[in-house]
Design a protein with these regions (language model features):
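Bacterial peptidoglycan biogenesis and beta-lactam-recognition machinery
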Residues: 209, 341, 371-373
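A conserved beta-strand-loop-helix scaffold within acyl/acetyltransferase catalytic domains
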Residues: 5-65, 111-113, 117-118, 127, ...
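Acyl-donor binding region in acyl/amide transferases
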Residues: 65-150, 300, 306-367
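Generic secondary-structure boundary/loop-capping signal
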Residues: 73, 157, 167, 376-378
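Residue-level signal for secondary-structure boundary elements
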Residues: 25, 100, 189-190, 212, ...
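C-terminal catalytic domain of photolyase/cryptochrome flavoproteins
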Residues: 15, 33, 41-42, 351-405
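A general structural signal for short secondary-structure boundary/capping elements
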Residues: 102-104, 203, 234-237, 348-350, ...
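Extreme N-terminal starter segment of soluble prokaryotic enzymes
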Residues: 1-3
């Protein structure tokens, strides 16, 4: 016999979620601390003494004392158990109604398809079956959009799995650029505290300025690191400006000497030397300016990663575009993913992408041979049926407005 509980112990919830095939950071009890602008509860279903369903519920206050609720990558349960699914949604609807909820939004961690770039996309048959189970439980599927703005969480994620990771799994482009990075005077550091937070925050600001977007601030990154403790880490890569400068300057002076000693009739050789000299002159000037600006070393890129259960999420990544020719991101991301797997993770989520699978972000991430995890999408569970249509319209208008800001 099932029993709905509205105050599940956070520790028991996490133990349950971490063992599930649907384990996801957004369902961790600590995620509520990160989303401090929402209130929250953890609800679930017991069968006897056994927890069989659980979900973090984020609660947003609306005008006139109404609320909306969101189950990020939840609920966690066996979606093949139709009786359990129907009981859960019937019970949570009744519970939410007492809290003046208009509707509940959810985006369960069900994979609609899994494939590599270039492979044929085949829909998982069990996902179709689970979709029918959910619809039978009176939740409304919101379709299969490809863009970012239509859903709270991206439907498409690029994920590297432990059994498909290594230098031999990189694409030709990835292997080449990693090799270039390894030859530069780059030093990658991993920190499970705020030691590298200032440098990480700086490269995130560089990314914001370059793309003309607003991401998060230093306080938010600190909140993530503090909240998840030893399960959150920064990967930062530094360029040794002094070593790089001395190496380039040595090549520059040698090139100058070679030009002086080059016979006048060796026109092709002289042309190549002068081209090299022009390039080295620019590089020397650039490095001189950067040494004045940054000192002996500079952080060129970084990532922020959180581990939960056997999964890991690279939540944020930034780079200083002035140093893109050193290929630091290839080394940084490789070391980040490597650290996740050394910590016992089976997957490393590099983040969401547009469903068109086009653009620079997809091109970069594709070099690590990721699997495309396409999630089943969002569902709505109407709670106040009379006001649901109006609230749904208002929600979509707000999403559209935010999209065009």
């Amino acid at each position: 016999m099932y029993k709905f509980i509205d105050k599940i112990d956070p520790k028991k919830h996490d133990e349950f979620v971490e063992k599930s095939v649907y384990c996801n950071l957004l369902q961790s009890s600590s995620w509520a601390k990160v989303k401090s602008n929402w209130s929250h509860e953890i609800v679930g279903v017991y069968e006897g003494e056994t927890l069989v369903a659980s979900s973090l519920v984020l609660i947003k206050k609306l005008p006139l004392s109404f609320t909306m609720m969101y189950l990020p990558r939840g609920p966690i349960m066996d979606y093949d158990n139709q009786e359990l699914v129907q009981f859960f949604f019937k019970a949570i609807r009744k519970w939410a109604k007492k809290r003046h909820c208009l509707f509940i939004k959810l985006d369960p961690g069900i994979h609609y398809s899994d494939y590599h770039l270039g492979d044929q996309r085949i829909v998982n048959e069990d996902a179709i079956r689970k979709l029918k189970v959910l619809e039978n439980a009176k939740v409304k599927h919101q379709g299969f959009p490809l863009d970012f703005s239509s859903t709270i969480q991206p439907r498409f994620h690029m994920v590297v799995y432990a059994n498909e990771f290594g230098e031999d799994c990189l694409t030709k482009k990835g292997a080449k650029n990693l090799k270039i990075a390894l030859k530069k005077h780059l030093d990658t550091k991993i920190g499970y505290n705020t030691t590298y937070l200032d440098d990480f925050s700086r490269v995130m600001n560089c990314t914001e300025n370059r793309k003309g977007i607003s991401l998060r601030n230093k306080d938010y990154y600190k909140l993530l690191l503090d909240t998840y403790g030893q399960n959150a880490f920064l990967t930062v890569t530094y360029l040794d400006l002094d070593q790089t400068y001395h190496e380039i300057y040595e090549r520059y002076t040698k090139c100058q000497k070679d030009i002086e000693e080059c016979p006048e009739n060796a026109t092709k050789k002289l042309f190549k030397l002068e081209e090299t000299n022009a390039s080295l002159t620019r590089e020397v000037k650039f490095l001189e300016e950067q040494r004045i600006k940054h000192g002996s070393k500079v952080c060129v890129c970084g990532t922020l990663t959180v581990i939960y259960g056997k999964t890991s999420e690279i939540l944020y990544a930034g780079m200083d575009n002035d140093f893109k020719r050193y290929m630091g991101p290839y080394l940084t991301w490789y070391k980040t993913i490597e650290e996740c797997f050394e910590r016992g993770c089976v997957s490393s989520n590099m983040g969401g992408v547009e469903g068109t699978l086009k653009g620079g972000l997809v091109d970069f991430k594709s070099v690590f041979h990721p699997t495309i995890n396409e999630f089943i999408g969002e569902f709505d569970l109407p709670v106040n049926k009379m006001l649901y249509s109006l609230s749904e319209m208002a929600y979509k208008l707000r999403k559209h407005k935010n999209k065009h800001k």
